[in-house]
């Protein structure tokens, strides 16, 4: 809300659970899946990448399987002109593999998918990770930044008009700048 961002739709990872099986079947039908030590992979070595792991040896799906299903669903549902994945740079190989597998599946729109990489966000010397329980909520961070701006305004310019709105703009702007700069 503080950023003025709205979403037309929102789907979590589990939304794609029933869409992964058909993707695996399609990969099989197109002759792209190969067995490697019990796991199912798409060989990407001819393209200078390690194999794309689709199913673990126990049959479990992986992020790549889910992302393939999600990409196809989004194209089928929204018929996008461009699909941007704004994700940390550490996931660069994952997205190169994703886009290459989509291309090998014959999806010409794979060229319209792009990974927009950014640096990892850290707080108090640790990289944030939801899986590892190191989380700072954006709402909390924005409110802290606004409060800091409010405090500085009170100290330096107590007679300033529209202090609350200016503190909001400065606090939110500082957080946005920090994330984009880093």
Regions found by a protein language model. Give the residues of each.
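Alpha-helical recognition segments enriched in aromatics with Gly/Pro capping
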Residues: 1-182
């Amino acid at each position: 809300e503080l950023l003025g961002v709205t979403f037309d739709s929102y789907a979590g990872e589990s939304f794609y659970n029933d869409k992964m099986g058909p993707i695996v079947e399609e990969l099989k039908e197109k002759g792209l899946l190969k067995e490697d030590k019990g796991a199912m992979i798409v060989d990407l070595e001819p393209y200078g990448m390690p194999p794309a792991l689709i199913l673990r040896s126990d049959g479990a799906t992986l992020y790549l399987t889910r992302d393939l299903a999600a990409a196809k669903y989004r194209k089928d549902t929204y018929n996008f002109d461009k699909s941007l994945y704004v994700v940390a740079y550490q996931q660069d190989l994952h997205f190169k593999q994703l886009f290459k597998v989509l291309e090998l599946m014959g999806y010409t729109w794979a060229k319209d998918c792009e990974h927009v990489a950014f640096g990892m966000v850290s707080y108090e010397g640790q990289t944030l990770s939801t899986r590892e329980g190191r989380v700072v909520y954006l709402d909390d961070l924005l409110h802290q930044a606004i409060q800091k701006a409010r405090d500085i305004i009170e100290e330096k310019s107590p007679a300033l008009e529209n202090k609350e709105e200016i503190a909001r703009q400065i606090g939110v702007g500082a957080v946005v700048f920090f994330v984009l700069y880093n």
